[in-house]
A protein has these predicted regions:
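Charged, amphipathic alpha-helical segments
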Residues: 1-14, 36-41
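Acidic surface patches and DE-rich sequence motifs
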Residues: 30, 57, 73
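SH3/SH3-like beta-barrel fold
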Residues: 26, 53-58
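Conserved beta-strand residues within beta-sheet cores
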Residues: 23-25, 39-41, 68
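Acidic, low-complexity, intrinsically disordered interaction modules
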Residues: 36-38, 44-51
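A short, Trp-centered hydrophobic/proline-enriched beta-strand micro-motif
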Residues: 19-30
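Structured surface patches comprising rigid loops and adjacent beta-strands/short helices at the edges
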Residues: 43-45, 65-80
Length: 81
């Protein structure tokens, strides 16, 4: 695994990826503790005050919300708070 990065940097990069419609590799936990892999998903919007980002699967158009503080890996980097 690569060098760890701060969550604020991750959020900035997700906003940029959403602006340019670039795919990301993201791993996060769900509220119940299960892991979810969002490899190849495109960030749509983020709400810094609400603490969520919406991601879209470009293959089928499915949209999901991810809680920012539950992200533990971004593009191969581990994430710390």
């Amino acid at each position: 695994m690569m060098e760890a990065i701060h969550i604020n940097y991750v959020l900035e990069q997700m906003d940029l990826a959403g602006k340019y419609r670039q795919r990301v590799r993201l791993k996060a936990w769900k509220k119940d503790g299960n892991e979810v892999d969002y490899t190849g998903w495109v960030p749509l919007t983020g709400h810094w005050r609400g603490g969520i980002h919406r991601l879209m699967n470009p293959v089928n158009g499915e949209v999901r919300a991810v809680i920012d503080v539950l992200i533990y890996e971004f593009n191969g980097h581990s994430v710390y708070l």
